[in-house]
Regions:
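Metal-dependent phosphohydrolase cores
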Residues: 1-79, 83-196
Length: 196
């Protein structure tokens, strides 16, 4: 089906209009991994004062997780944990979490969403902030896992001499992780449209 819907206000939409939109959505959704990778590449050359640029940091974080035997979903969370830096200077973990939310486990999502607070353990005190801010989550089931993510992968990923895997290595993983949402208000409609 090709074409465009004809309404100028959604209240005037018809079944035919929404069939056109749904068909287009499926094709568009399949390109999500490519769009995410394009956005991730915006981090290249952006050092923000750090020893490596933000793309290198992301690749290093994911490479360390992969080489440590983490599963693909975890590795993609590691790759994308700072993708929000470009649009969410004050809440970058929330941006990454919003992208990942339909596709990853609640455990990995929480880790990505909270990593900024947990990472603060290493530097908040230099900025006049409370480095122990993560303690508010001490009773959360993902508390130790998020400490581990930051300590082993995120905080350690600023080494200019580390041999990171290339972005192309992670592309097939991206395709698999983003192939089908686990949770979304559109999940049932998307699945129905793909089988039609």
């Amino acid at each position: 089906m090709t074409g465009q819907a004809r309404f100028t206000h959604m209240q005037d939409g018809t079944q035919e209009d929404w069939a056109v939109i749904a068909a287009d959505f499926s094709a568009y959704a399949r390109q999500l991994p490519a769009r995410i990778l394009t956005h991730l590449k915006l981090l290249e050359g952006d050092f923000g004062g750090f020893p490596v640029d933000r793309l290198t940091h992301s690749l290093q974080t994911a490479s360390r997780a992969w080489r440590d035997g983490r599963d693909e979903e975890y590795v993609i969370c590691a790759l994308l944990h700072d993708i929000g830096d470009t649009l969410g200077s004050y809440n970058h973990p929330d941006i990454a979490a919003a992208i990942l939310k339909p596709f990853v486990s609640a455990e990995n999502l929480w880790m990505v969403e909270k990593h900024g607070i947990f990472q603060g353990y290493y530097f908040f005190h230099y900025l006049g902030m409370d480095r122990h801010l993560r303690e508010q989550f001490r009773e959360h089931p993902q508390y130790l896992a998020t400490i581990e993510f930051c300590a082993k992968y995120d905080a350690a990923a600023f080494d200019p001499d580390y041999e990171s895997l290339p972005l192309s290595f992670f592309e097939p993983m991206m395709e698999r992780v983003f192939a089908q949402p686990r949770q979304s208000i559109y999940k049932a409609a998307t699945a129905q449209n793909q089988t039609a």
